[in-house]
Amino acid sequence: MRITYISQARFPTEKAHGHQIAQVCAAMVRLGHTVTVIAPDVRGTVRKDPRAYYGVRESFDVVRLPVFDGLRSWWVPGSLAFFFTMRSYARALRSYLRVNSTDVLYTRSPVLLPSLLHSKISVILELHTLPRRTSVFVRHCRQCQRVVCLTALMRDELIGWGVDSSKIIIEGDGVDLRRFENLPSSSEARTAWRLPADRRIAVYVGSLITRGTIEKGVRELLAALALLKERGVFGWIIGGPRDQIDRYRVLAVQSGLGDEDVRFEGPVSNTRVPSALAAADVCVYPAPALQHSFFLRDTSPLKIFEYLASGRPTVSADLPPLRGVIDSSLVHFCQPGDAQDLARAITEALEHPKVSQEKRAALLAHTSWDARMKRILLLSPSV
């Protein structure tokens, strides 16, 4: 089957969603489908081939459509730049789809639905958050062949808006288990990353902020590391954006943490993440005590799955969306926004690691990218 993945943003990209898109497309290729990624031809910082950049072996075409890049046009007001870019991209998409046939259109961008639905080709929409509720968006969801929600809470809200439950499938992000085969030993990984051999290492891998300005729990992690300083716990924080790192470095110093207590690695390629996790004693997914939809409804379990795939003890903030897929037999939970409870959970994971190996193996098998995409495509009425 021919599947065309429509990206709203440049591809490849240094942002986390690009990794997710690459994994989705690679899985569909492994399932025997022919995949093409369509993206706007806008200037970005990543120049590498997508397969090399994301560390995937499967081959899929990438087509970049010429568009007006409002974000790079100095004379376009910032508030209008995205609008004009998407308007230009919508026209380019309609022209492309008129002359290039495909069986299914796949996207995670609701803003592109008018152009995709206009083509009369079957559309699968994957939602990573819900836009503002409008009658137009609900109507577009009803016209899609399948709507994929990352969490049950997202699905429930969408049904409440009037979308038929039979169109919706709940599928969190997946994990590529092959990336975690033949991991280096802890000592080998620490040597490669130049990490202290005599410290217990707590690692966080991921974005420091989300949706532009929302903190993801690094502040709480630094406070917990300050509490654990006397226990010899070394904090390793991997991720960007880089413009946030200096701010957190200042906060670390204010918390009494020096370079011998915490390292900010900055962004690393996805291909290096497994070896980074192998170097750690415990993997941490913190969160602030914010009543924001990202934490209450939309949080993806992708990073938790990767932590579990590494075989390391895992500490996670107890967030409602994550409770739908993991429980206390798999991770050590802590209260969001509570540095003392985070320090407690890290200590517990280091001294009394717990994980049900049977449940872990079953969860990871169920949530592999291949299994995930097979369920999505099989449940789509026209596929």
Predicted features, each with a name:
Residues 153, 174:
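Carbohydrate-associated surface elements
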Residues 276-297, 312-313:
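Acidic donor-binding loop of glycosyltransferase active sites
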Residues 239, 246-277:
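Nucleotide-activated donor-binding/catalytic signature segment of Leloir-type glycosyltransferases, i.e.
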Residues 49-54, 181-195, 357-358:
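A short helix/loop element that forms part of the nucleotide-sugar donor recognition site in Leloir-type
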Residues 301, 328-339, 348-353:
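Conserved acidic donor-binding segment of nucleotide-sugar-dependent glycosyltransferases
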Residues 7-15, 27, 31-84, 96, ...:
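N-terminal strand-loop element at the rim of the active site
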Residues 185, 337, 351-380:
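A charged, aromatic-enriched C-terminal amphipathic alpha-helix characteristic of glycosyltransferases
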Residues 4, 196-216, 222-225, 236, ...:
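Conserved donor-binding/catalytic core segment of Leloir-type glycosyltransferases
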